Design a protein with these regions (language model features):
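Sec-dependent N-terminal signal peptides
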Residues: 4-13
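A sequence-level/structural motif corresponding to short, flexible coil/turn segments enriched
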Residues: 16-435
Length: 435
């Protein structure tokens, strides 16, 4: 969830404490590995997938012609999951889309990073300062690429998360020079401000969200000692980071959860009030909410944390097994329920609930109530490796997850049987109302 979606009290729908039903599944790609990194919707219920594609790819009857090695792709689906168009850009090297959001007019904004030095955008070469540079791009409702803005230096710089405020300004986060950052642009791509920490703070921004008053929340990781404006940041090891900013980019508070080895939020969400949920992973152990979560081996365990409006931890939950466990996407319905997605590659336990693997990597989708109680869990996938990266909620009763799959893969009553080695997908789930 990248922004607060406002809707009136009379549209509120209470959801039953049982798993949702899968409404549809869309998949597409080419002969190699393709995946969706981010998903969002517009006011009409159309679905936008920010993805990476290796080689030529087909999305229903829509074709993407590869520009080189890996291209960033933006695919628009209608509310029934049928592809309307595919757009994007790329060059001879690796170029990825990592975040997507829409405005009230149906324009889509994408952030990510590109390595290619031969990317052409509207007849002009996109400048690259070295290795990977971060980009922000605007696409019209018909898929036309309107503009691209670039940030970065000689090292590897990344764009990861994007959100939009009530004025139509977009904000992005990622990493430049090994530090997290936040940049705000207006709708025409003019930079309004850019912020990053001072001192010896390293880390990366991964998720970004807005509350109902246009406050900005960054999620990711940080280590070292320094400050973000007047807000001190200090952690001896890599810590899961949530940082609240004013609409002008000034720091208000920070919450850090250090891992004995490392910890990071892959995505965050907030509601209109400014309550925050983070989904990520850690190695070693973390102390949070009066508990110690310990990994059973050297692989990652999943972490889910809920903060109040002051940045204080309210509850935390653990995805814990002998294999690799990831909590990757999180969203909220603005009424205290949070939804989390991710994947695991061996039998695992989510907040006390056992999950059994069907293959080498399985998808989970789960709901938590306002106090952190596990309401339901839904699994998806097949006998091979399947992943769920992003999740978004569309009022009153829709959840959409996305990622990569290998066939055959099952999502509720739907089965995907045709794909290449790994295709991107999106799956819409309908929440059940309380009877």
């Amino acid at each position: 969830m990248k922004r607060y979606l406002a809707f009136f009290v009379f549209t509120i729908q209470l959801h039953a404490a049982e798993p949702p039903a899968c409404d549809w599944v869309f998949s597409g790609g080419g002969a190699s590995h393709d995946k969706t990194r981010a998903v969002t919707t517009d006011g009409a219920g159309n679905v936008f997938l920010a993805s990476e594609c290796v080689g030529d790819a087909m999305f229903g009857d829509q074709q993407h012609k590869s520009a080189g090695e890996m291209d960033m792709c933006l695919t628009k689906l209608d509310a029934a999951g049928m592809p309307l168009w595919v757009s994007g850009f790329g060059g001879s090297k690796t170029d990825r889309a990592y975040g997507v959001i829409t405005d009230a007019a149906g324009n889509a904004y994408v952030t990510g990073h590109f390595e290619s030095t031969d990317v052409m955008v509207n007849g002009e070469k996109l400048p690259n300062a070295g290795n990977f540079d971060a980009f922000t791009a605007k696409f019209a409702p018909d898929g036309k690429l309107l503009w691209v803005r670039v940030k970065g230096g000689e090292g590897s710089d990344y764009g990861h998360g994007i959100a939009i405020d009530s004025k139509g300004h977009v904000v992005i986060t990622g990493a430049i020079g090994g530090q997290f950052f936040c940049t705000k642009y207006d709708a025409e791509g003019r930079e309004i401000w850019h912020r990053s920490p001072s001192g010896k703070v390293s880390g990366s921004g991964h998720g970004i969200a807005m509350d109902g008053k246009d406050h900005i929340y960054l999620g990711g990781s940080a280590s070292g000692a320094g400050a973000f404006g007047k807000i001190a940041i200090e952690s001896k090891t890599s810590a899961a980071l949530v940082l609240k900013l004013t609409p002008e980019g000034e720091g208000e508070w920070v919450n850090l959860i250090p891992g004995t080895t490392s910890a990071i939020y892959h995505e965050i969400a907030c509601d209109s009030q400014g309550r925050v949920w983070g989904a990520g992973m850690f190695k070693g152990s973390v102390n949070v909410a009066g508990q110690t979560f310990q990994c059973s081996g050297k692989d990652y365990d999943g972490l889910i944390v809920h903060l109040d409006v002051e940045g204080q931890v309210q509850w935390a939950r653990h995805l814990h097994g002998p294999g690799t466990d990831y909590c990757l996407g999180v969203t909220t319905d603005d009424h205290g329920t949070s939804f989390v997605c991710g994947d695991f590659n061996q039998d695992t336990v989510l907040a006390g609930h056992a999950l059994t693997t069907r293959g080498s990597g399985d998808i989970f989708l789960a709901a938590f109530d306002v106090k952190g109680g596990l309401t339901w869990v839904q699994q998806a996938g097949g006998k091979q490796n399947d992943n769920a990266y992003p999740i978004t909620f569309r009022a009153p009763d829709e959840l959409i997850i996305a990622g990569a799959l290998s066939t055959p893969a099952t999502f509720g009553s739907h089965e995907v049987t045709i794909s290449a080695s790994s295709d991107l997908y999106a799956a819409k789930w309908k929440l059940k109302a309380v009877k």
